[in-house]
Amino acid sequence: NEFWKRTAKFWMKLFGINFAIGVATGLILEFEFGTNWSNYSWFVGDIFGAPLAIEGILAFFMEATFIAVMFFGWEKVSKRFHLASTWLTGLGATISAWWILVANAWMQHPVGMEFNPDTVRNEMVDFWAVATSPVAVNKFFHTVLSGWVLGGVFVVGIGCWYLLKKRNREFALASIKIGAIFGLVASLLSVWTGDGSGYQIAQTQPMKLAAVEGLYEGGTNVGLVGIGMLNPEKKTYNDGKEPFLFRIEIPSMLSFLAERDANAYVPGITNIIEGGYQQKDGTIALSAAEKIERGKTAIGALAAYRAAKSAGNEEDAQVAYKVLQENIPYFGYGYIKDVNQLVPNVPLNFYAFRVMVILGGYFILFFIVVLFFIYKKDLSKMRWMHWVALLTIPLAYIAGQAGWVVAECGRQPWAIRDLLPTSAAISKLDVGSVQTTFFIFLFLFTVMLIAEIGIMIRAIKKGPEV
């Protein structure tokens, strides 16, 4: 069918432009681990490097091979092989996302490793625990589905641009229909994965959950803040100021989402810092001050172990090793100087989360309205809807970035939760060097972004092949 062939070629061209930029920026990102994050690379390179290596060897080469056939194989290979190459390109991109998100999830919830005091490195002991972590699985589905939502919004928006310009009507309506159906399904599924993300955060990163909700004092039957404004004067968890100027809550909803029990206890920022509450495993939560002391003990025990080993004193080495093993879960806390460092930026996380959720709800409504107009009305005549669709494109990018703000800023101060704070993960570089390279890459990435947008606009203006 020539119509669908032209349609596929057009969207393939836009995909290829984004793919090229993704490869260019991704390669630069790989080098950053050695240049800017050398302590991190040494401390956990044995674990973090494995999924990235698999991503590069398996997924990237798979994409690179079959994308060439997908683009240049028209009329040169059989239709079945070309179709298979197209699907394998998409599969390769999905596998690539899996291993990248496995690495990211491990930073948020480190599992499957042991600390080796002889090398001062964490070493992998259970690959499958890392690769199939519940945090990784949920993060993968939520991230990929969010990407599909963005793709659906993009296709609908560009299709509406053609309708606005009164061009390629048949192509535009067919693309809009597919984009809206695909986007709606992905949007609805992302609600489910988003709920799973909230549950996983509650189990593994309670401080992030508390920051996202602006929850300072926990309790049972905790409500979910639907609408609220934080008090800008509240600077620390214990300054006595009210956290909100106003808020509207859904009663008991946070307890239900976090623990699947409306009566469950959810700790707040103050509770996590001060400790003393009963955790799900029945143990009493340690205070942040106690964790910091145990972290310092672990760091001291590591130094004592290495000194004893160097001196050939096995007895002292074993004593130090035992102390280290008892306190290793708190190793990263030894680098924390003030308990307030353990609290993420509450306003940033609180508002970013709500931007993501509100836009996610808007996308569901948007796709439903678009499909209604396609099947029940004449969408090609609704200019106001064309403008709405165009303006929705940047909102999809904003929603995705808001989600990553919560994911990455919500876990601060940790590069690896409880094991390595961000401040200790960096390379020993002077400020001037970091600033110089930052602005160089900022300039390069800005140029690449401008080039990408320019090339895409030209391709869109040209339209599908006639």
Predicted ranges, named:
Residues 1-466:
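Polytopic transmembrane helical bundles with strong interfacial aromatic enrichment
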